[in-house]
């Protein structure tokens, strides 16, 4: 059986309490990598322990074995559990044993007609839904599926308490955003992404990886198969073991690729619409985003795929398509609501704090930084091509003072990554003339604060 962390046990307790109060549907929100499957397995175990039947719905066949193994490891009575794809359940309504509880993982998909067909048929059965992002491109909420919502600990807390890995975020732009066009679904079309990326020098992708994440186990997210394969070829030509995988890859070949990646035989795994949900490789420490998107769900799932916690691990996120300008960072505070959000003509609301890229090392940093916390070099503003989110609300910040004789000050020259103690971050802040908040922010980002 699993030993739940306190924050996971709290989710279990809150969910059971809501169900005991006759809630028809409870939506549980917890960040990617926070161990939602373990929470689900514990709720299923406690339900079957009382003789209740559980129906667990998945939207992809590949996830069935994974959740089944998780349930079995947690001593869930599988005789009382139905684990199937939503399509198969919808086609077997009336033939399957009636459940006492319906559990849906990745429930941001649950507005689809197939899910609604199941929920309507079992209208008197309470349901639990799990997601990291209760958000849809069309702005629709989930109040017609769930009547209450429980939020777990945020990403920033999970990093600070060593349940998620701290990260570095770099953005070396390889896309012309002015050429991106949306489809009826609300996300960018593949054709417009082709135009926006243009004649990408794939060697630049490899060069950036070598500079920022050399040797790290890396997942690449591409927008189409041809592009993904060309990126893989560029890595191979550089002598780096790499492979491409997508939904059309044969099952046996796909299993071998996944196995080789998990074992370390492959350093680079590039994919198209395959590795976002339910794929767990804790020692993957880097992701490369080559697919621009308007989907917050997709951004979070892809950006945080490398942030599974391991001792001394520092994740690296390389964003070649400036998705951060649309969504902020993985640990940007977000306001979730069952009612959804009001869609705007020029994209969705971005509550992210203003951020920009350092022109020297391409680290994404708060807009008020005048000295990069990653490379220690002075940052000038837009005149030097800084990528700044001008749609974000600018919060009032104090003036930063640049330390005179910068090159002579050993603490001013140090990077935040080079120190291990919180007090050393405060020394760097003092040497550079920063306010104490800079040290606190970096201490949280680096996982030094509990």
Segments from the language model and where they lie:
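Conserved segment of the helicase C-terminal RecA-like domain
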Residues: 306-331
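Inter-Walker segment of RecA-like/P-loop motor cores
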Residues: 64-98
């Amino acid at each position: 059986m699993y030993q739940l962390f306190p924050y996971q046990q709290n989710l279990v307790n809150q969910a059971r309490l809501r169900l005991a109060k006759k809630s028809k549907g409870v939506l549980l929100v917890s960040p990617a990598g926070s161990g939602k499957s373990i929470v689900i397995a514990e709720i299923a175990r406690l339900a079957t322990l009382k003789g209740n039947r559980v129906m667990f719905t998945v939207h992809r066949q590949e996830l069935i074995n994974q959740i089944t193994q998780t349930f079995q490891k947690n001593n869930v009575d599988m005789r009382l559990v139905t684990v199937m794809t939503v399509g198969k359940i919808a086609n077997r309504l009336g033939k399957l044993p009636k459940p006492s509880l319906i559990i849906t993982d990745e429930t941001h998909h649950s507005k689809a007609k197939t899910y609604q067909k199941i929920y309507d048929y079992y209208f008197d059965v309470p349901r639990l839904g799990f997601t990291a992002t209760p958000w849809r491109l069309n702005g629709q909420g989930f109040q017609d599926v769930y009547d209450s919502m429980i939020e777990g600990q945020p990403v920033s807390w999970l990093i600070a308490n060593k349940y998620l890995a701290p990260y570095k975020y770099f953005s070396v732009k390889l896309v012309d955003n002015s050429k991106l066009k949306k489809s009826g679904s609300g996300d960018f079309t593949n054709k417009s992404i082709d135009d926006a990326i243009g004649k990408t020098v794939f060697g630049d992708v490899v060069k950036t990886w070598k500079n920022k994440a050399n040797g790290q186990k890396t997942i690449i997210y591409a927008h189409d198969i041809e592009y993904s394969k060309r990126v893989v070829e560029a890595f191979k030509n550089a002598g780096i073991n790499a492979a491409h995988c997508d939904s059309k890859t044969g099952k046996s070949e796909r299993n071998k690729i996944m196995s080789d990646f998990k074992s370390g035989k492959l350093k680079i795994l590039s994919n198209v619409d395959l590795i976002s949900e339910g794929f767990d490789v804790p020692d993957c420490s880097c992701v490369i985003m080559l697919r621009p998107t308007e989907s917050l769900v997709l951004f979070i799932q892809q950006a945080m795929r490398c942030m599974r916690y391991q001792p001394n691990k520092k994740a690296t996120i390389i964003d070649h398509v400036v998705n951060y300008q649309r969504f902020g960072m993985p640990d940007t505070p977000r306001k979730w609501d069952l009612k959804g959000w009001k869609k705007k003509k020029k994209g969705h609301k971005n509550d992210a704090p203003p951020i920009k890229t350092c022109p020297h090392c391409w680290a994404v940093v708060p807009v008020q930084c005048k000295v990069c916390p990653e490379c220690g070099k002075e940052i000038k503003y837009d005149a030097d091509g800084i990528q700044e989110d001008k749609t974000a609300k600018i919060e009032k910040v104090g003036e930063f003072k640049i330390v005179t004789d910068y090159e002579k000050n050993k603490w001013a020259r140090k990077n935040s990554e080079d120190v291990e103690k919180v007090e050393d971050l405060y020394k760097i802040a003092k040497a550079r003339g920063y306010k104490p908040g800079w040290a606190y922010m970096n201490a949280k980002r680096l996982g030094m604060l509990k």
